Amino acid sequence: MRPLILLAALLWLQGFLAEDDACSSLEGSPDRQGGGPLLSVNVSSHGKSTSLFLSWVAAELGGFDYALSLRSVNSSGSPEGQQLQAHTNESGFEFHGLVPGSRYQLKLTVLRPCWQNVTITLTARTAPTVVRGLQLHSAGSPARLEASWSDAPGDQDSYQLLLYHLESQTLACNVSVSPDTLSYSFGDLLPGTQYVLEVITWAGSLHAKTSILQWTEPVPPDHLALRALGTSSLQAFWNSSEGATSFHLMLTDLLGGTNTTAVIRQGVSTHTFLHLSPGTPHELKICASAGPHQIWGPSATEWTYPSYPSDLVLTPLRNELWASWKAGLGARDGYVLKLSGPMESTSTLGPEECNAVFPGPLPPGHYTLQLKVLAGPYDAWVEGSTWLAESAALPREVPGARLWLDGLEASKQPGRRALLYSDDAPGSLGNISVPSGATHVIFCGLVPGAHYRVDIASSTGDISQSISGYTSPLPPQSLEVISRSSPSDLTIAWGPAPGQLEGYKVTWHQDGSQRSPGDLVDLGPDTLSLTLKSLVPGSCYTVSAWAWAGNLDSDSQKIHSCTRPAPPTNLSLGFAHQPAALKASWYHPPGGRDAFHLRLYRLRPLTLESEKVLPREAQNFSWAQLTAGCEFQVQLSTLWGSERSSSANATGWTPPSAPTLVNVTSDAPTQLQVSWAHVPGGRSRYQVTLYQESTRTATSIMGPKEDGTSFLGLTPGTKYKVEVISWAGPLYTAAANVSAWTYPLIPNELLVSMQAGSAVVNLAWPSGPLGQGACHAQLSDAGHLSWEQPLKLGQELFMLRDLTPGHTISMSVRCRAGPLQASTHLVVLSVEPGPVEDVLCHPEATYLALNWTMPAGDVDVCLVVVERLVPGGGTHFVFQVNTSGDALLLPNLMPTTSYRLSLTVLGRNSRWSRAVSLVCSTSAEAWHPPELAEPPQVELGTGMGVTVMRGMFGKDDGQIQWYGIIATINMTLAQPSREAINYTWYDHYYRGCESFLALLFPNPFYPEPWAGPRSWTVPVGTEDCDNTQEICNGRLKSGFQYRFSVVAFSRLNTPETILAFSAFSEPRASISLAIIPLTVMLGAVVGSIVIVCAVLCLLRWRCLKGPRSEKDGFSKELMPYNLWRTHRPIPIHSFRQSYEAKSAHAHQTFFQEFEELKEVGKDQPRLEAEHPDNIIKNRYPHVLPYDHSRVRLTQLPGEPHSDYINANFIPGYSHTQEIIATQGPLKKTLEDFWRLVWEQQVHVIIMLTVGMENGRVLCEHYWPANSTPVTHGHITIHLLAEEPEDEWTRREFQLQHGTEQKQRRVKQLQFTTWPDHSVPEAPSSLLAFVELVQEQVQATQGKGPILVHCSAGVGRTGTFVALLRLLRQLEEEKVADVFNTVYILRLHRPLMIQTLSQYIFLHSCLLNKILEGPPDSSDSGPISVMDFAQACAKRAANANAGFLKEYKLLKQAIKDGTGSLLPPPDYNQNSIVSRRHSQEQFALVEECPEDSMLEASLFPGGPSGCDHVVLTGSAGPKELWEMVWEHDAHVLVSLGLPDTKEKPPDIWPVEMQPIVTDMVTVHRVSESNTTTGWPSTLFRVIHGESGKERQVQCLQFPCSESGCELPANTLLTFLDAVGQCCFRGKSKKPGTLLSHSSKNTNQLGTFLAMEQLLQQAGTERTVDVFNVALKQSQACGLMTPTLEQYIYLYNCLNSALLNGLPRAGKWPAPC
């Protein structure tokens, strides 16, 4: 401190002196103001708690000195203590050695001359220091931590303690303490968790902090268990521990002192210690660890199992036993030896012992030794056994048995010796001297029971005598009784006698018996046991056994034993009723006895009921008051001394108690429910028996716990008696009988067929017996019974007549039997009002006058609906009106238009009647044919062909009904006279008339939904008319010139038919045979001969080959060779291509085929049909059945022509008479019609017409109109059911033949939406009807043919029959032979398939069926316009899953079908068949081009759309404009503008610079906008060679950005503009459209596809996106759409359909 003060003083003094000098130098100068600007001063500690650093910035230039002073400040803010001073000329100064955290006052003085000093006073504080000695340790609790620290040097205001959970970084505690606090305890912490503690020292706003980490202690497990798993493994278990991150296990071997440790992760609560020492105690300790903490938990002690000793051997030694073994692994506490046998002994040995001696003398016998090893609480033991024989007990000094042989001859000869031999040994066994005079010889130490020979030899070696004998055998060992299996048997056994023997002998004697011992039994040497039989039960016997060898016996062994007493015999247990008790009886057993032991058990549950000891004389015993219905068992045994015999058993029952509260109820006509209540006691089962009139009907056995049962299949309405019996074993007790009735049977369904005024009620009764009961049908009106009628049980049908039409009543059937009655549910009969009758339509040009008769009944109004028929078979709603009258005028209609009128009556019960529909056409306004039409064209040939042109009589020629050809030989007539139509060929040929009507035929241009021909050529003079005076196209007179005129007959329903004539044609000469060249005639003759020979050879070959199958019997044999050769069957995979090819050029190929078929079969005889008696039976005079195939009815007596009906057998696919085709019945042929049905066993009738159309009756109503049957001849027809649907009606009839007394059911299927001479609206409806027909035919049991009819039985009938046959052919042969099928049909019935439209429609149906594919294929294909939005939504579902699936099919089809337009096999077409024409493709290069290559493709547009030529690649002006001219293009579309960076293309002419090529010259005419605002350029193209000109409209549409599709509205608007351009001009056929794109082929593909799809939608009302995309992709791979573009086609088309097609839906216009 002193140096600082001194330094400060020196600095001050120096400054003072300097200031004085300065002030001296300023004397005489002006005074300056005192003070000056302040300094900018900054104070900091520079990170040091004992320093303060001052820095400043002077406000004035120039060097000044600075004086600084520093003093500490107390808590009240007053300076105190020693002042520190300093002086400097720098801009900063640092004070050292200050107190941390203390406040100081600083003064900074700027020393300026003349004492104008400036002083600044500041207060600052030094930074505090951190605490010292910070510690954080456990406080003895898992949830607490204790923190402690020492004071921080210097001053401070407080300490802040922040405790964080380290893992989650969450704050656990935040507390501030005073500076005097030096410790803190944290509680409620998580055990086993690491925390960080921050201690912050605060001094004002300054702070210093330090931190420390620490863990809380974990919670050790409170339970530990140790379990032995074997000799070397222990398993430890413990419960969970809170906060432990791991567990330390220490297992201590308490014998060896070794430790085994393991560290277990958290979450595991078990561990197995392996490879331990067997038989060793172990102590386990567990420690829970968390961080540095290890907390020991409980301990456990357990032993391992001891290991087993091995090689235990028990050896007999004389009269003692010796045991030895090998010790097992590991440790043990000792051994326990337990010897059992004739003598028992237990001893213990130390753990180190391995042998033991059991000292003798031990009695002989079988001994077993159990050696048990002990280790703690566990042991392990093994056993060994051996036999101890008596020989082992012989004294050691006895060497063996002794042989004593007598019979030695006495001799005094010295030196004699006795030589001993054995039978088993080859040499001498002994050699002893024989004393003189000895008479016996003795050998010792021999084998007992053995045979020996002794030779007596002299001193010279001579044998003087040989003697032999046996040693005495030893007795058998261990004689004992081993079994007493029967009271009269004892089984004894013994051990083999030592040595040798020849056998054993056994004898026995009963104690107390005066008889001698029993029979002696001699046994072989190997027998060691014997069963003594037929002994007296309950008696004691002494048994002796010994061994023998030779004549010697061993000592006998004796044993004393007793037989067991015999059990009592014939024990029985039964129930005695007088008195009521359970009684046991028995007979005395043989043998001895002292008493009887008697026990009685109840078996369920097993309970001892009684136990008695009865005297030996007792033979029965009884028990009273036992539980009823229980099974008991008695056990009886004989007592004799301490012995007890086996038990004799017998069972018996106590009778059960009868059930109570028996109740019988009926819930159904064939059921009875029986219930009862249990009574106390037991039972084994219940038996419930059902009786009907004392006859047992059924029996049911129930379990003892059941309290009810049901009887099924009973007779309804019948009284029954029920008996319930409770059984207990063989005993039973019956309850009182109970009687009950079953409910009467009622119909389970009432089927009501309603007609106006009556109802047929069919009662469906349940199957089975009807039973008894009385039934009534009841009608109620407004809840009151109004009518009742008795019914018979099982009655199936009854009629309700005179019901009020339009009224509602309720009906039920009620039946009663005994006290029970049942009723069906109420059936509400809402009687349908009858239909209107006598409907008459009076047509006019602009209105229809309608009259009818209202039906009787409770009716209200009549609803009249008017619909206009539109082309294609559809209708357009016009209006509807309700009226209560019977006449109505329908105004404001269109002339010559067909309307469908539907009249429906509304009853007051809100029921509508059956609609009566009729088609009525307004009449035409006055038809004004030309006065004289242009003459027809005549074609020359062997005959003459007159060509009739469509429109030759004006645009209203659709009103023409018939055309006629008038021929004349008058060369001066300008036009025919009206009288000419009255003359025929007969008048001309035989009577000399110049002009005559040669031919009359219906209008071939009748409007159809399919395209018709533009001209019709008919041959004249082709028929051989003989003498017929009718209109006949007879041969013309040779050598005459003829002129021809066409006459038209109107279709007006006026009294006088309007006629129109054409001018006569130029004269043409008829060709006579006389002028035909000879070579031509000879060629014709030879050709005819060759054809005849070929046919004869073919027939001969068929005869040799044998008959064909029925299926092919009518295929080709009657067909001209050239037709069969030309028209082959079409394979299924090629059918679509064939169809599209035949559809080209206005169905020209179809027309040619149909023309070829017109004359088929016409020359076949029809004599029976033309007979005068039968003419009136034909509906149309030109539709007559051929004789060879007509159906013949049974001829009626006296009526030779009654077998005729206008019907033919038609061969089906598999049978020659599979189908009958007939006309719709006339009133006069109704009886014949039903005779046909009955005699031919027809079960299915197909009706393809309505009864009336356009006011014309097409077919009589030949079935009952309601439930009232009708009779025709002997056949009565009942209408059983009628089910009308949208497009067909199903009916079922019952036919009853009056004379044959037989019944038969016939089903009728009527297709109601097929107009006469026309086709249905769509193939799908007819195909669905065919499937229904096939199902009904298969379900019909009858084998008769199918009957098909329409009106004439040829047009619609022929189409339907051909479709049936061809569908079978498709299924069986995978081909379709349409032409030959129709050919065969026409050979059997004329005019089968009557119109060209029907012929084409037949092909359409087959194509639709082919494209349907398998039933389980995908649902892509042609989609109806009405269903398109739903189809789009279905495909877009699940992230466009449907689109993705269909697009994959498209890619596969493109890959697989390189040349085929058929979709892949799993591709499915549904709904309406697409009629897109085949694509004709040509290319300028062989492969699909890149952008620099050129390719052109042609897409024909069909009859109503324009042809479309697509040009891709870089086309020059020559290629482009010459292609425009060659393809007669009138509209040119250019997609995409050229790149602005490239040179403008030179394919477009400019105003003053036309384009000139070798073929054409192209001029720009004008530029304008189309009506829709699209830029358009008009060009004039001049052909150089011919000079012809043509105007070409060019629309240029800029494409969108690359990779983006145009907005749907933009593309649709552009297509509309293109369509307007295509259809300009007078031609009905639009001009060709040529589209060109040099680069954007994808967008060109989208443009082309949308153009084709919109045309489909407009013309066909279906769209086929799949096939359109497939065709384009096969035409050019660059136009293959991406998945996004494919989805775009759907979305764009859906937008067009939802918002209306372009041009108000008239899309046939677009190209």
Curated annotation (Swiss-Prot):
GO terms for cellular component: membrane. Residues 37-129, 130-222, 218-305, 306-391, 393-470, 475-569, 565-654, 655-749, 744-831, 832-926 form the Fibronectin type-III domain. Substrate binds at residues 1316, 1350-1356, 1394. InterPro entries: FN3_dom, FN3_sf, Ig-like_fold, Prot-tyrosine_phosphatase-like, PTP_cat, PTPRJ_TM, RTP_Phos/Ushers, Tyr_Pase_AS. Keywords: Glycoprotein, Hydrolase, Membrane, Protein phosphatase, Repeat, Signal, Transmembrane, Transmembrane helix. It is an enzyme of class 3 (hydrolase). SMART domains: FN3 (SM00060), PTPc (SM00194), PTPc_motif (SM00404). It is found in: Membrane. Glycans are attached at residues 42, 74, 89, 117, 174, 239, 259, 431, 570, 620, 649, 663, 737, 851, 882, 970, 982. It catalyses: O-phospho-L-tyrosyl-[protein] + H2O = L-tyrosyl-[protein] + phosphate. Residues 1096-1711 are cytoplasmic. Belongs to the protein-tyrosine phosphatase family. Receptor class 3 subfamily. This is Receptor-type tyrosine-protein phosphatase V. It comes from Rattus norvegicus (Rat). The lineage of its organism: Eukaryota, Metazoa, Chordata, Craniata, Vertebrata.
